[in-house]
Amino acid sequence: SVMDNNGLEYATGVAKGVSNVGNISGDVPTYVISDDLRAKFELKGFAASLNPTDPTDAALYPGKEGYTYGAKNNLKLIDMVGLDYNDPKWDLLLDELKLSEMHQLFNKSGWGSLAVESVGKPKTYEYDAPHGIANFLTDAVIYSYPCATMTAATWSQDVQRIYGNAIGEDAIASNTEGWYAPGINIHRTPFGARNYEYYSEDAVLTGLCSAAVCAGVEAHGMHAYIKHFVMNDADTNRAANGCVAVWGTEQATREIYLKPFQYSIQKGGAQGIMLTMCRVGWQFTFGSYPLMSAICRNEWGWHGCYITDYTTTMKGAGADQYLAAGGTLIHATAEQSLSDVKSGWCRKLLREAVHQILYLSLIHI
């Protein structure tokens, strides 16, 4: 038993010979990266996103002459209800917006997206907290629920669906359109600072739990922003010193770390993703075209909205990288400007981001 052979002391005492900053032997390993890899850490803007297109290609990214702004097509957002994402009528609606309105929708979406009078889009409200809606802007009464790790221990998708339904009911009562949850990163160590937000160390269990919660939430008209995409397994230096860099093989990334997000989208209908502040390899996750567009949008067929709350980098080159990767919303209450909103590539990708925002606001009507 734990009481034999000093078991209690071993279980509760301080480990010997372990450095606070080292590995279990107390040693601190040193790794040296190549000059080529080091140079990649210095990339900024469009180039850092690894978007495979050429931002100077005028045929792909025309200038002002390639777009219409402020058109009078007599359409409102409500007229789009029930239309497919690729319905050509969306272009007529998007033609009614001004470039400045598109820019603001993209870069000023803290705790919800702005109203757009020209197309009759109302303001929306979105809140944080993985175990209930942390509504701090109104007097609405909402509830807190057991943590994800506890509910995962039930091994019950029925429990998770009830959980999602309950939070969905709270959303209706509190006029909430978006929820920055559930948290679906993988437990890598018992010392993980946010383990209580995440379900388990198993990708399938985590994915099935999250999918059931998302299905319940989305059925009530609120959007789940599953987080943190992706490989957010440490909070130390996650946003400091250039951000912690997490490394993994493609097989491990797909089979373990991406799997819960795939389940949540394809089985649970999740319409939102909140990104991490870390890097995967050398690249910021909030500015990774391979992750955000090649996998989620192109492979999984997802038309939902990304949001990043790493606002300290969302000015100029940081915002450029995010938009070029496929980003949609910046969680900021102060404007975070692109370096050149009038450039051809910014015009086209802003239009696509706004298309996603407007589509999301109608998908459950």
Residue positions per predicted region:
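Glycoside hydrolase catalytic-domain context in secreted enzymes
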Residues: S1-I363
